[in-house]
Amino acid sequence: MGWLRFLLLVLVARPLALFLTGADVTGREHLPLKGPAIVAANHSSHVDTLLLLAIFPSRAVARVRPVAAADYFLRDPVIGWFSRRVIGIVPVARMKSGQRAQASGEDVLAPARAALAAGDILVVFPEGTPGDGDELGQLKSGVARLAEAFPDAPVTPVWIQGAGRVLPKGEAIPAPLNCAVLVGEPMAWAGDRHGFMAQLRASLLALKAQAPPLRWS
């Protein structure tokens, strides 16, 4: 990671994310400090990415790379530069509704697997796009395919509470409000995609149940 990205993350993005969210973090000790590793979090706002980058220690943030939709984050040269150079995204193509990766002939997870092979810590949002509020949506199986390809890589579930109120879906201006981040114990690949996804969903919902009440509600 270049010094520019490191300085912007530590000196700009981290203070901004902490100011906007308060970042009450539980279970920080479960965060992976080296890769290959996967962090799987719920997704209610674009603030989620900055918040997750903010809670990693400086010695590990160099390897943290969020998986993001190429068509959204690379649609504009300025946004694309910031997304790649500062946030450090791993851009992947999104399949159209009802389209399967196998049918399209495109290996959409190839960039993510390459990042894991390089020793990165991937941040993935299995719901895909930000949902509405703090309810967990349907999880896509891409994270299971990554875990299957790298069975020794830990998969750490994370529940983010309240980010959807800091920057609701469709809004452009954030509002400083308190959020909670709950980091669960890492999961290991057990050889079955369906079982893995069920375990991940159960882990995320268990973390959600432990989240404190929203202080501004």
Which role fits each region the language model picked out?
Residues N42, A69, E127, I160-G162:
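Cofactor-binding loop segments of dinucleotide-utilizing enzymes, especially the Rossmann-like FAD-
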Residues L33-G98:
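Catalytic core of membrane glycerolipid acyltransferases/transacylases, capturing the structured
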Residues M1-G22, R75-I87, L167, E171-P176:
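Alpha-helical membrane-targeting segments
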